[in-house]
Curated annotation (Swiss-Prot):
Subcellular location: Secreted
Disulphide bridges, residue numbers: 100-150, 105-152
Keyword Signal found: yes
Single GO MF annotation: cytokine activity
Quaternary structure (record): Homodimer; disulfide-linked. Heterodimer with IL17A (IL17A-IL17F). Forms complexes with IL17RA and IL17RC receptors with 2:1 binding stoichiometry: two receptor chains for one interleukin molecule. IL17F homodimer forms predominantly complexes with IL17RC homodimer, whereas IL17A-IL17F favors complexes with IL17RA-IL17RC. IL17RA and IL17RC chains cannot distinguish between IL17A and IL17F molecules, potentially enabling the formation of topologically distinct complexes.
Stated name of the protein: Interleukin-17F
Gene name linked to the record: Il17f
Organism taxonomic ancestry: Eukaryota, Metazoa, Chordata, Craniata, Vertebrata
Function: Effector cytokine of innate and adaptive immune system involved in antimicrobial host defense and maintenance of tissue integrity. IL17A-IL17F signals via IL17RA-IL17RC heterodimeric receptor complex, triggering homotypic interaction of IL17RA and IL17RC chains with TRAF3IP2 adapter through SEFIR domains. This leads to downstream TRAF6-mediated activation of NF-kappa-B and MAPkinase pathways ultimately resulting in transcriptional activation of cytokines, chemokines, antimicrobial peptides and matrix metalloproteinases, with potential strong immune inflammation.
Induction: Induced upon antigen receptor binding in the presence of IL6 and TGB1. Up-regulated by IL23A-IL12B, IL1B and TNF and inhibited by IFNG and IL4 in CD4-positive T cells. Induced upon fungal infection in innate lymphoid cells. Induced in lung epithelial cells upon bacterial and fungal infection. Induced in brown adipose tissue upon cold exposure.
Matches recorded under InterPro entries: Cystine-knot_cytokine, IL-17_chr, IL-17_fam
Family as reported in the entry's similarity comment: Belongs to the IL-17 family.
Top-rank taxon, per record: Eukaryota
Length: 161
């Protein structure tokens, strides 16, 4: 009977020591100053490409009946093309940005009219910027000015006095 009581006590002490070791490891991960976890040592982090972020971008209560023409950038009097910008430290990592094809506008005959100006339409958007901290990543919101299309405007004319 004495042997089983000693065995039970040894098991309890081992479980207590294991629990304390786990708590210490968790505390070290939450507070890097308390101790550097093994994963955060240089060279032990997984490659950046293996890290992904999942964001549900479905829009609820959107009107499903309206379809937007896909090639309106070609039918505009100020046509534009899209260029893809890539940044692995940004989410989304790829963003399409408009670039005006001409400095002037296209007239009814399909010719460029240099008496009018083709200018980019800009929209401020929010993106997530990845900030690596050891192996874990945190993200911060960042404003970005994005060219979303082009429009035709009258030029600004300054009169000399």
């Amino acid at each position: 009977m004495k042997c089983t009581r000693e065995t039970a006590m040894v098991k309890s002490l081992l479980l207590l020591m294991l629990g304390l070791a786990i708590l210490r490891e968790v505390a070290a991960r939450k507070n890097p100053k308390a101790g550097v976890p093994a994963l955060q040592k240089a060279g032990n982090c997984p490659p950046l490409e293996d890290n992904t972020v999942r964001v549900d971008i479905r829009i609820f209560n959107q009107n499903q009946g309206i379809s937007v023409p896909r090639e309106f950038q070609n039918r505009s009097s100020s046509p534009w093309d899209y260029n893809i910008t890539r940044d692995p430290h940004r989410f989304p990592s790829e963003i399409a940005e408009a670039q005006c094809r001409h400095s002037g506008c296209i007239n009814a005959q399909g010719q460029e009219d240099s008496t009018m100006n083709s200018v980019a339409i800009q929209q401020e958007i929010l993106v997530l910027r990845r900030e690596p901290q050891g192996c874990s990543n945190s993200f911060r919101l960042e404003k970005m000015l994005l060219k979303v299309g082009c429009t035709c405007v009258k030029p600004i004319v300054h009169q000399a006095a």
